[in-house]
Design a protein with these regions (language model features):
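A short glycine-leucine-enriched loop at secondary-structure breakpoints
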Residues: 102
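Conserved class I S-adenosyl-L-methionine
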Residues: 43-49
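A short glycine-rich, Lys/Arg-flanked "PGG" loop and its adjoining helix->strand segment in the class I
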Residues: 123-135
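A conserved beta-strand element that flanks and buttresses the S-adenosyl-L-methionine
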Residues: 109
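Class I (Rossmann-like) S-adenosyl-L-methionine-dependent methyltransferase catalytic domain
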Residues: 1-40, 52-99, 117-124, 138-203
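Short catalytic micro-motifs in class I SAM-dependent methyltransferases
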Residues: 112-113
């Protein structure tokens, strides 16, 4: 057991998404779309680490998106296909998928996933996603954590200024960030976690 897991066992913190039910996740999607004034009807949406497809399924019902999901679990993808027969689902490593896909997207979701990758890998992933976003498209990084927070024993938290530095390097991306607890409410969200929205503003 690593230090992060031990801390979570003692304090009950960590893995906030495990506390969230279907209704919570659907409300998060709705509030994020409202905040960015996004109309995704008929557009391609990619969920990297899609789990059982709760977010994609909600968007499919509400906005008739073209859903794409990537996950390592066969069982998760089986559930996705049951919910969305017309979806496109891949059992693949996220970086390997991003290396081969030719599809362009108007939203890419990375909720509770990016911290599983090293900081260098996170830079690579975001750069690859930027290349497959349409102009006006949004990368939603949920459950982001920083090294100075109570998540200092998390697998790979990022340093303060990480996203500002990325956007200074990649001028095609615009940054917006907010507290998940403030926006989504209901007390299930850790005040140290943020949602990061990176919008592609130019080629």
């Amino acid at each position: 057991m690593n230090l992060y897991s031990l801390r979570n066992l003692i304090t009950g913190n960590g893995a906030v998404w495990l506390k969230l039910n279907t209704s919570d996740l659907e409300k998060m999607v709705e509030k994020t779309l409202y905040r960015k004034n996004l109309d995704l009807r008929g557009k391609n949406v990619l969920d990297l680490g899609c789990g059982t497809g709760t977010m994609l399924s909600y968007l499919s019902r509400k906005q008739k998106i073209n859903p794409f999901g990537v996950d390592l679990s066969r069982l998760n993808l089986y559930q996705c296909r049951k919910k969305m027969e017309s979806g496109n689902f891949f059992r693949q490593d996220i970086i390997k998928y991003l290396d081969v896909t030719k599809t362009k997207f108007d939203m890419v979701i990375l909720y509770g996933v990016i911290g599983c990758f090293t900081v260098d890998q996170q830079r690579i992933i975001i750069d690859k996603i930027s290349s497959i976003l349409n102009v006006g498209g949004v990368l939603w990084i949920g459950a982001n954590i920083y090294t100075d927070s109570s998540y200092k024993f998390q697998t790979y938290p990022v340093p303060r200024g990480f996203y500002e530095e990325l956007c200074n390097t990649n001028k095609s991306l615009d940054l917006e960030e907010f507290s998940e607890l403030e926006v989504f409410g209901n007390g299930k969200y850790d005040p140290d976690q943020t949602t990061v929205l990176l919008t592609k503003i130019t080629f």
